[in-house]
Each structure stands twice: as structure tokens, then as C-alpha cells.
């Protein structure tokens, strides 16, 4: 398992568009991945769970990935979370 703390740079936080991008990215890997925000564990494959998470720009989250391509999954998901160009 690999883990990284990330500061979310998506300007409007995780709403439907970035949630879809995160989910699509996560589903492109065999590794299981999740985002830890406070006491919440969010499955990155679930758009609804991501939207409901209440994660805003500037929040610090942990991304955890476990599986055969865990490092690539971690890089992919964190790059989306750190992308400040994703708009509404």
C-alpha cells in the first residue's frame, strides 16, 4: 500500500466534474484507491461519495492505493487533486 498527503488545488473543491475525473482516473487502474478526509474514507470509484465528501480547495487529504499498479494509481489521482485548472 502506498499513501500520500495532498493539498487539494481544485478551485471549487470536489463537485461533480472533478469527481467524475477522479473516478475515471481511479477506474483506469487495478489498484483499489481511497481518499481519507478527516474520519471519512471515500471510495474513489464512487462519484456520489466523492461529491458528498465536502472536500474544498485547500483541504489536506490522504490518498491510499493498494494493488498491482498502486504507484501509478497514486500518481494519477494526486495529479487530479493538485490540478488547479479544473473548472466548474
Question: Residue ranges of each PLM-predicted region?
Answer:
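C-terminal structural segments of small proteins and small subunits
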Residues: 54-88
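Intrinsic-disorder/low-complexity, polar/charged segments enriched in Ser/Thr/Lys/Arg/Asp/Glu/Gln
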Residues: 1-5, 60-62
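Compact, glycine-rich, soluble single-domain proteins
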Residues: 7-53, 57
Amino acid at each position: 500500500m502506498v499513501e500520500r498527503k495532498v493539498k487539494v488545488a481544485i478551485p471549487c473543491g470536489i463537485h461533480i466534474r472533478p469527481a467524475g475525473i477522479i473516478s475515471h482516473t481511479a477506474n483506469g487502474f487495478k489498484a483499489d484507491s481511497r481518499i481519507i478526509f478527516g474520519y471519512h474514507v471515500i471510495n474513489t470509484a464512487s462519484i456520489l461519495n466523492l461529491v458528498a465528501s465536502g472536500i474544498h480547495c485547500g483541504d489536506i487529504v490522504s490518498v491510499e492505493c493498494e494493488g498491482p499498479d498502486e504507484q501509478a494509481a497514486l500518481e494519477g489521482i494526486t495529479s487530479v487533486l493538485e490540478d488547479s485548472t479544473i473548472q466548474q
